[in-house]
Amino acid sequence: GFLRKLRKATSDCIIDMEGERFSGVLSRLSGAKNRYGPTGKNAHRFYNNPRALNYEKHRYNAFGEILDVLVTGKAPANILPYTLGSEVREAVKGFLESKLITQPFVVIHPGASADYKKWPVEYFASLVTQLKSQNLGIVMIGVGDDTRMIDAIAEQLPNVAIHHFDQLGYPELVALFQKAQFYIGGDSGPMHLAASAGLDLVALFGPSKETIWAPLGDHSRVLRGTKACGKDCDAWQCEFNYHCLTSLIPEVVFGAATATRVAIDMRKPAFANETKETNP
């Protein structure tokens, strides 16, 4: 089974970023001689190299503290130098051509790992209508519960072409992001992947602390609603039904999207001039 395969891997080192009970148990059962993970309750049972992390800082920095003793140098906190094979780029090009997407397009991920992070379906429908008025193609990504949300958005817009890509792995997603004009979505893994690929993005935040979970990068905008979170607002309950997110209206997000497009256009001439100077 899985545990047998895990132990047969004979790893010298296990690094547990999650620090949860399940991942800690797997770290211990791996048989690795060196097991690194965050300090916490029962950490001594799982790791022989526990690390005290500052969880008040951005998770990028907190997780980096585990690696400080193992590697030299720092990983970039902005764009990562992804290396993609030609077959990956050709696959994404084929996806776009099959959907007849020839105009600039925006990638939207409406889903999230928890309901309290999800912007309302009707808001996404309104936003898509406004984006289409600017002749932007709409590409939505997501699987599982995300698919049901995307279907609900599409039902409200029977005459609008919404292209759903649900068969993409991580390399294909990066290739898609590198072709897109910008990204819109809530606090989720794809949001961070888009930022690391260098894509301009508009992030829709509710109770999540942006000091810890905001997308990194020079071209990321984090939006919140006009109403503050309640004192008890967390992943399990909110006396105001998470109005910190629901008070973020589509018109504000569309305004941020428009500003993002303007910023992209303003960067293009400088890039063109730089290319001209370095390539006479």
Give, region by region, the residue ranges found by the protein language model.
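Catalytic machinery of carbohydrate-active enzymes
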Residues: 1-280
